[in-house]
Swiss-Prot record:
GO terms for biological process: dUMP biosynthetic process; dUTP catabolic process. Belongs to the dUTPase family. The lineage of its organism: Bacteria, Pseudomonadati, Pseudomonadota, Gammaproteobacteria, Enterobacterales. The gene is dut. NCBIfam families: dut (TIGR00576), PRK00601.1 (NF001862). This is Deoxyuridine 5'-triphosphate nucleotidohydrolase.
Length: 153
């Protein structure tokens, strides 16, 4: 069963020039978001730009959050990443979805009208309460070993 999430169209080109975000295959986890811009953007090396997707969403379910993720091809082929690496959309946010993109390459990158620039997925949300303790009851094998504790190979 699919959950319903309200979407509000902010750009009148949807349905004419652009499609609503959609799953491309039955196994797709994410839906692509498009650059709803009025003119092409030349993203210079080491430059960041904020781009409209042309939509607002209203998740309206406190058990679901949205995540904005990069498109792997943009990063691998062109060095274009999300400047905040992952964008979190809280269940009670109702504003426009904006994408902050960073060109980490040494070449200019052209963002055209309607380009697919990021993807959105929806995930279950678990809110927690902190339980303050003096020590952990069950000690794991890993304990407090972090950053690189398992080696390189």
């Amino acid at each position: 069963m699919k959950k319903k999430v309200n979407i509000r169209i902010l750009d009148k080109r949807f349905g004419k020039e652009f499609f609503l975000p959609k799953y491309f295959t039955d196994g797709s986890s994410g839906m692509d978001l498009r650059a709803c811009i009025d003119k092409e953007i030349n993203l210079n090396p080491n430059e960041t730009v904020l781009i409209s997707t042309g939509v607002s969403i209203d998740i309206s379910d406190q058990k679901i959050s949205g995540l904005i993720l990069p498109r792997s091809g943009l990063s691998h082929k062109y060095g274009i990443i999300l400047s905040n690496t992952i964008g979190l959309i809280d269940s009670d946010y109702q504003g426009p979805i904006m994408i902050s993109m960073l060109n980490r390459s040494n070449k200019n990158f052209l963002i055209s009208i309607g380009d697919r620039i990021a993807q959105i997925i929806f995930v279950p949300l678990i809110q927690i309460e902190w339980n303050i303790v003096n020590k952990f009851v069950k000690i794991t094998n890993r304990k407090d070993m972090g950053f690189g504790h398992s080696g390189k190979n």
